């Protein structure tokens, strides 16, 4: 067990809560002590959802451990079914309750309810949140479809032709507390619709048990988030013959590749191939002269596997950055992240310790960090610009506006979120250079208006300035020195002048000529 201030993922029952809260007509009975009810805040505060999660806690206390906690579980299950009337019931236990070994899922199945009951056995001490979400989604699909898959033939992805209808796909993987999942779904549905493809079911987000039973009506599955949906997609492929996409449509190139993959699996002709690259502003900017400033910028990337791999591809192939660090906290995606890092000739960082990530960040010396809210705090301490690209996130990363990461509009959002911190850094750098120049006037009216006031006078500051002025006045610039100084570009002239005067003072020189300026340049490099 490790004590830490922050953690990238919660225990697996939080992942189960994410799936349950994303769906309709499902209820989750969680055998847990009173302290484990904190997870409600994740949905009401961070996700800013108008309703609390569909979860009933048994909330046992220390005094209950001396009695029959199994009866407490049964009572809560009965009350939840009678009150909420779910069409499917999930039953599981938190990390603390796992130690008691009451087996609430087995108890629920023996109580004679006429609704499907999904027994969630999530090993809290060896697995994490994303695995819990993936396993929960998989168990729901398996429970609701296990009888139907034996009654149907293997699904042909091209059957839409013989049925005389438009092709249909399922979009699998988006959940609450995922990174921009709601907006990603809208963007991908829009792209598919433009290609003449209908959406059959989106799950888990917004789906019901009836929708899960309709998954087999689609021709193929779109796996949007591998951490959540890949196991379910594999099960559907193995048992129903349903093909699924593997390309994540984040970035221009990946979005184009995604569209090609969908068309290829459906055997659907692609008619607007030449128009695809004009859907976003990112390619235009990458070809513009302004983007030259960004070429070769060092970037450090850390997040969940899906977003980290996609970010690395965009950074290298679409923005011309140099990726100096790539890693993930998701051990289920470690193999894919290592492969992506190998392509970049760097070593992947697989860890769930934010301190290790911060240490790697320091050693890499990046100019931009792309990570989670933890990396935002670390980058702030190190004075490096940062953009959040992955969960875990805070409320500021769940905007009320439309802000996807996937598709054409997602590329625009990424362009804004990544480029702006660097451009603002350039502005601060230029101001820092210009303020030393002769032509720079620091006394212009502030953009804050007339309310801006000067800092109060300080005797020590005045004395230091006076001493510095006396020292500067004691150094004489000769005509040859002044003439040589004017040849220095104005945006670095102030720094050269300052460095030369420091050099002259350190050497005890009474005047500065052209030779002194050359010597100072050689000294400071």
UniProtKB/Swiss-Prot annotation:
UniProt keyword terms in alphabetical order: 4Fe-4S, ATP-binding, Chlorophyll biosynthesis, Iron, Iron-sulfur, Metal-binding, Nucleotide-binding, Oxidoreductase, Photosynthesis
Cofactor: [4Fe-4S] cluster
Residues binding [4Fe-4S] cluster: 36
Cofactor note: Binds 1 [4Fe-4S] cluster per heterodimer. The cluster is bound at the heterodimer interface by residues from both subunits.
Enzyme Commission designation: 1.3.7.7
Record: active site: 290
Listed pathway(s): Porphyrin-containing compound metabolism; chlorophyll biosynthesis (light-independent)
Catalytic activity, reaction form: chlorophyllide a + oxidized 2[4Fe-4S]-[ferredoxin] + 2 ADP + 2 phosphate = protochlorophyllide a + reduced 2[4Fe-4S]-[ferredoxin] + 2 ATP + 2 H2O
Entry GO MF terms: 4 iron, 4 sulfur cluster binding; ATP binding; metal ion binding; oxidoreductase activity, acting on iron-sulfur proteins as donors; oxidoreductase activity, acting on the CH-CH group of donors, iron-sulfur protein as acceptor
GO BP of this protein: light-independent chlorophyll biosynthetic process; photosynthesis, dark reaction
UniProt binding sites for substrate: 425-426
Family: Belongs to the ChlB/BchB/BchZ family.
Stated role: Component of the dark-operative protochlorophyllide reductase (DPOR) that uses Mg-ATP and reduced ferredoxin to reduce ring D of protochlorophyllide (Pchlide) to form chlorophyllide a (Chlide). This reaction is light-independent. The NB-protein (ChlN-ChlB) is the catalytic component of the complex.
Subunit structure, interactors included: Protochlorophyllide reductase is composed of three subunits; ChlL, ChlN and ChlB. Forms a heterotetramer of two ChlB and two ChlN subunits.
Protein name (Swiss-Prot/TrEMBL): Light-independent protochlorophyllide reductase subunit B
Native source species: Prochlorococcus marinus (strain MIT 9312)
């Amino acid at each position: 067990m490790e004590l830490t201030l922050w953690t990238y993922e919660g225990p697996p029952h939080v992942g189960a809560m994410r799936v349950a809260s994303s769906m309709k007509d499902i209820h989750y009975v969680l055998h847990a002590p009173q302290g484990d009810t904190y997870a409600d805040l994740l949905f009401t505060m961070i996700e800013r959802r108008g309703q609390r999660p569909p979860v009933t806690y048994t909330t046992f206390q220390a005094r209950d451990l001396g009695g029959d906690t199994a009866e407490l579980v049964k009572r809560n299950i009965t009350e939840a079914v009678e009150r909420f009337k779910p069409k499917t019931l999930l039953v599981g236990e938190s990390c603390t309750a796992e130690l008691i070994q009451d087996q609430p899922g087995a108890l629920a199945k023996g109580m004679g309810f006429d609704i499907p009951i999904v027994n969630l056995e999530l090993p809290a001490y060896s697995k994490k949140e994303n695995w819990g979400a993936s396993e929960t989604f998989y168990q729901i699909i398996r429970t609701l479809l296990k009888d139907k898959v034996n009654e149907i033939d293997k699904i042909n992805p091209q059957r839409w032709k013989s049925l005389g209808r438009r092709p249909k796909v399922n979009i699998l993987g988006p959940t609450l507390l995922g990174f921009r999942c709601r907006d990603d779904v809208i963007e991908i549905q829009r792209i598919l619709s433009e290609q003449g493809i209908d959406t059959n079911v989106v799950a888990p987000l917004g789906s019901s048990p009836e929708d899960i039973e309709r998954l087999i009506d689609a021709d193929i599955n779109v796996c949007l988030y591998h951490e959540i949906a890949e196991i379910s997609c594999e099960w559907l492929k193995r048992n129903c013959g349903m093909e699924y996409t593997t390309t994540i449509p984040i970035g221009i190139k990946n979005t184009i590749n995604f569209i090609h993959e969908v068309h290829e699996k459906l055997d659907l002709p692609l008619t607007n191939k030449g128009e695809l690259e004009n859907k976003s502003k990112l390619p235009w900017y990458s070809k513009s002269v302004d983007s030259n400033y960004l070429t070769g910028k060092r970037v450090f990337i850390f997040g969940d596997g899906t977003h980290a791999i996609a970010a690395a591809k965009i950074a290298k192939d679409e923005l011309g950055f140099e990726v100096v660090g790539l890693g993930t906290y998701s051990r289920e995606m470690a193999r894919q992240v290592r492969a992506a890092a190998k392509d970049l000739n760097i070593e992947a960082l697989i860890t769930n310790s934010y301190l290790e990530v911060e240490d790697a960040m320091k050693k890499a010396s990046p100019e931009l960090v792309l990570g989670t809210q933890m990396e935002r705090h670390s980058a702030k301490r190190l004075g490096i610009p940062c953009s959040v690209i992955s969960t875990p996130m805070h409320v500021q990363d769940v905007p009320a506006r439309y802000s996807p990461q996937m598709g054409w509009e997602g590329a625009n959002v990424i362009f804004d979120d990544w480029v702006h911190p660097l451009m603002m850094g350039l502005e601060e750098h230029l101001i820092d250079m210009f303020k030393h120049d002769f032509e720079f006037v620091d006394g212009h009216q502030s953009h804050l208006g007339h309310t801006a006031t000067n800092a109060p006078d300080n005797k020590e500051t005045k004395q230091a300035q006076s001493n510095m002025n006396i020292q500067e006045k004691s150094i004489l610039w000769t005509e040859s020195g002044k003439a040589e100084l004017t040849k220095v570009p104005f945006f670095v002239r102030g720094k050269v002048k300052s460095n030369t005067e420091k050099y002259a003072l350190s050497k005890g020189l009474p005047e500065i000529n052209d030779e002194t300026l050359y010597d100072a340049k050689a000294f400071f490099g």
